[in-house]
């Protein structure tokens, strides 16, 4: 029986002084804190003797910057996979909530909010799971018998976890267990998913970090 681990790594903190829901918008880089988070995760993986043979990231800048020190630490080339990109969202580029009310309290946006189970304001949860599961399966095959790191985003990672654990895809975003620079590590025996564990190597930097998610 061949054991393989696919680590789903969420990117570090993003420089986002306006508090926008940045989604797939270009140019959203890691903050200084986010860069430190990426370095901590890379050091964590290398120092604990992980057998990482591949590192793959979403095409978005924040994911690429998070993946770079991990790839460097293991001496492997950084690859890109569009299937692990952030979720599409109609509120991209807007302040979703805040002192002024945000996009959710603007009546012009209410027609997009009629179905929280799909959801009606963005990429269907099922579509996100489908593309992520395909990327995970290809990653498992590529790194069979070893470990691979996929750098993605909070919502796609969380939905993948819920699907694997048999949970509903609709959820309260405040209850997502997928913090900045966290690892959701999926374990496989041959092609069978056998469990996961969740770790936060950069937790020491969470105090004062931005709470705004990308989607």
Region spans (language model):
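Short, well-ordered beta-to-alpha junction loops that form the rim of enzyme active sites
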Residues: 57-60, 83, 151-155
């Amino acid at each position: 029986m061949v054991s393989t681990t696919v680590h789903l790594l969420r990117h570090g903190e993003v420089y986002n002084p306006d508090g926008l829901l940045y989604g797939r918008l270009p140019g959203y880089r890691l903050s200084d804190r986010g860069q430190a988070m990426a370095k901590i995760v890379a050091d964590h993986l290398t120092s604990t003797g992980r057998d990482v043979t591949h590192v793959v990231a979403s095409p978005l800048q924040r994911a690429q910057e998070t993946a770079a020190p991990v790839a460097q630490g293991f001496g492997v080339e950084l690859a890109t996979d569009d299937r692990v990109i952030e979720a599409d969202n109609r509120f991209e580029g807007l302040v979703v909530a805040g002192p002024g009310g945000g996009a959710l309290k603007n009546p012009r946006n209410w027609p997009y909010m009629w179905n929280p189970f799909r959801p009606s304001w963005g990429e269907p949860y099922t579509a996100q799971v489908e593309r992520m599961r395909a990327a995970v399966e290809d990653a498992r095959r590529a790194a069979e018998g070893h470990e691979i790191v996929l750098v993605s985003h909070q919502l796609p990672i969380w939905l993948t976890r819920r699907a694997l654990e048999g949970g509903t895809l609709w959820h309260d975003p405040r209850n997502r267990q997928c913090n900045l620079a966290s690892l959701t590590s999926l374990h496989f025996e041959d092609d069978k998913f056998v469990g996961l564990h969740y770790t936060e190597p950069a937790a020491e930097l969470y105090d004062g970090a931005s709470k705004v998610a990308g989607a």
